[in-house]
Swiss-Prot record:
Mg(2+) 2 binds at D98. Belongs to the terpene synthase family. Mg(2+) 1 binds at D93, D98. This is Bonnadiene synthase. Diterpene synthase that catalyzes the conversion of geranylgeranyl diphosphate (GGPP) to bonnadiene. Cannot use geranyl diphosphate (GPP), farnesyl diphosphate (FPP) and geranylfarnesyl diphosphate (GFPP). InterPro entries: Isoprenoid_synthase_dom_sf (IPR008949), Terpene_cyclase-like_2 (IPR034686). One of its GO terms (molecular function) is terpene synthase activity. Its cofactor is Mg(2+). PANTHER family: BETA-PINACENE SYNTHASE-RELATED (PTHR35201:SF4), TERPENE SYNTHASE (PTHR35201). Mg(2+) 3 binds at N234, S238, E242.
Length: 363
């Protein structure tokens, strides 16, 4: 890939009043997770190991689950490593995976459908046993030994939702067309894939949620807000990386710039204001409703808090975003996100954002 000449954008600190936490066994979780991933032949050798360590995916899991069993936290770290498949499947970025999978699947919808079906029926070998499929099915097997059937069904449903939204994003890239901002808001919450990690919270934590717990309007609202915050924050952190790949950059910043007819630099504070307003609403709804929830639902909401904070704290120093092509500083500029947090929102308006599918969060 011939990288474009791109300068990283200045991203201001993000409002997040949730304190940072981290698992005391991070070093062990990281070692075992990278060993597991490299065991399938991906990111081989010391160079691959250094790249994975710089990305800090085990730290994301360790920050999201700072008190849970280390081996269960490692399953999440393994899964986050696996989702680098997104680079090939959705973003058609092969800059660091050419040695494993030389091209994106020609029919994403067919691949996605078969992949989900294999999670539902693990004995059905519907796709070739390449390293990505073998590692995914290993995760499925391990989860099946500790998760209840309804928990596996929720995780598989979250996986399906992610791949459906990802198909939309892939279409936009292939059509070289930016979606409208309203459509992007609808797409991005699911396309972020975080629902697949969050769906594992009860498994990692060793508790059981009921369908009623998750269907409660307040829990639905904070879940959707958390997923949206993480997705939009990822857009801010990953913009430099995405801008270096071929095709249009389907990112909140670019969509705002395209819709408003402004520069990318001017779109950044608009994106930050949007996420800050959602962060304010998240905290208000969360604090108002937590006392009315049962023990399991309270633990689940606490995991949402930690995911929001973990994503910011990991992303701010991950070389996946600061040095996406893994080049010396003399060859490629670095993105910098320090400080990553602020105690003051850039927009604390109590009014709903003007998008019909999320306005109900302010009801």
């Amino acid at each position: 890939m011939n990288p474009r000449t791109v300068q990283p954008l200045d991203v201001p600190p993000l409002y997040c009043p949730i304190p940072p936490e981290i698992h005391p066994d991070l070093a062990l979780i990281e070692k075992r997770s990278i060993d597991w991933f490299q065991g399938f032949g991906v990111f081989p050798g010391e160079a691959g190991r250094a790249l994975l360590r710089g990305w800090q995916f085990p730290a994301l899991a360790a920050r999201a689950y700072p008190e849970e069993d280390a081996e269960r936290v490692r399953i999440v770290a393994d899964f986050v490593h696996w989702t680098t498949f997104d680079d090939v499947l959705i973003d058609t970025d092969h800059s660091h995976v050419d040695d494993v999978l030389p091209g994106a699947p020609p029919d994403l919808l067919a691949v996605a459908t078969k992949m989900v079906r294999m999670l539902e029926v693990p004995d059905a070998a519907l796709l070739p046993g390449d390293p990505w499929i073998r590692s995914l099915m290993d995760l499925r097997r391990r989860l099946g030994t500790i998760a209840a059937p309804e928990q596996m069904a929720r995780w598989t449903g979250a996986f399906r939702e992610y791949l459906l939204a990802a198909t939309w994003k892939r279409f936009c890239r292939q059509a070289r067309r930016l979606p409208s901002l309203a459509d992007y808001v609808t797409m991005r919450t699911a396309d972020g894939g975080v629902q697949m990690y969050v769906a594992l919270s009860e498994v990692v934590g060793g508790y059981r949620l009921t369908d009623r717990d998750l269907a409660t309007p307040a829990v639905r609202a904070v879940t959707e807000m958390a997923l949206t915050l993480i997705a939009w924050d990822n857009d801010l952190f990953s913009h430099y990386k995405e801008s270096l790949t071929a095709g249009p950059c389907i990112n909140l910043i670019d969509v705002i710039a395209g819709e408003r007819g402004c520069s990318l630099e001017d779109a950044v504070p608009v994106a930050v204001a949007m996420r800050d307003r959602v962060m304010c609403r998240y905290m208000a709804v969360r604090e108002r409703t937590e006392r009315d929830l049962g023990v399991a639902a309270r633990r689940y909401v606490r995991s949402l808090d930690r995911w929001i904070a973990a994503n910011i704290d990991m992303s701010a120093t991950s070389t996946r975003y600061t040095n996406p092509l893994n080049r010396p500083a003399t060859e490629m500029p670095r993105a910098r996100f320090t400080p990553a947090r602020t105690d003051l929102p850039s927009d604390d308006s109590p009014l709903a954002l003007p998008f019909p599918d999320i306005a109900w969060w302010w009801d």
